[in-house]
């Protein structure tokens, strides 16, 4: 069996990011009276004036750092491996993660919902990019899986992830 290196362990930070984000999404509504998860965006929980902002920041503190480190080491690990199409899909996903991590921190909603301020316009622009890349990257990975047997498992996982969106 191959010895695991630092990059392998950094890849596990994706699990930490998932747990941090899940905790923020599950528990922050408890600090937001009247929050309706069926009618309101998750961004409302981290809006500049949201009553849940402090709890959101605490619970999601590890999310951005861990997601960016994880996706970056995945990009490092995939270099020169598999197909160019698969790598392109993974790199697009990494770009989406970086845009999400930086963009949402720079431009949280100014108010729950949409107040129309410059900050809100930028938040929506970040959201549009994140949504576009969140769809494009798995589609490219699915195509890579359909074209190459060595990428099939990546394609299946991407198809499941896309279906869950």
Where are these regions (language model features)?
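Alpha-helical transmembrane segments of multi-pass membrane proteins
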Residues: 18-36
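Hydrophobic core of alpha-helical transmembrane segments in multi-pass integral membrane proteins
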Residues: 19-22, 137-140, 156-165
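Membrane-proximal helix-loop-helix units in multi-pass membrane proteins
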Residues: 100-145
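Interfacial helix-start motif at the membrane-water boundary
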Residues: 45-65
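Aromatic-anchored segments of alpha-helical transmembrane domains
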Residues: 96-106, 161-165
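Membrane-interface interhelical loops and short amphipathic "cap" helices
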Residues: 36-51, 111-121
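Interfacial segments of alpha-helical transmembrane regions
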Residues: 7-14, 81-95, 150-160
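Internal transmembrane alpha-helix with an interfacial aromatic "cap," most often the third helix
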Residues: 61-89, 136-147
């Amino acid at each position: 069996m191959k010895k695991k290196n630092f990059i392998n362990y950094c890849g596990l930070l994706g699990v930490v990011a998932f747990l941090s984000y899940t905790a923020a999404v599950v528990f922050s509504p408890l600090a937001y009276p009247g929050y309706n998860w069926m009618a309101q965006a998750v961004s409302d929980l981290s809006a500049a004036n949201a009553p849940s902002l402090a709890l959101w920041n605490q619970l999601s503190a590890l999310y951005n750092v861990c997601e960016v480190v994880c996706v970056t080491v995945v990009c490092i690990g995939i270099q020169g491996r598999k197909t160019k199409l698969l790598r392109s899909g993974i790199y697009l996903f990494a770009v989406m993660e970086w845009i999400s991590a930086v963009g949402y921190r720079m431009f949280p909603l100014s108010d729950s919902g949409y107040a129309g301020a410059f900050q809100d316009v930028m938040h929506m622009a970040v959201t549009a990019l994140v949504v576009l890349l969140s769809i494009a990257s798995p589609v490219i990975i699915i195509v890579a899986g359909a074209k190459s047997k060595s990428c099939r498992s990546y394609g299946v996982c991407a198809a499941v992830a896309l279906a869950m969106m």
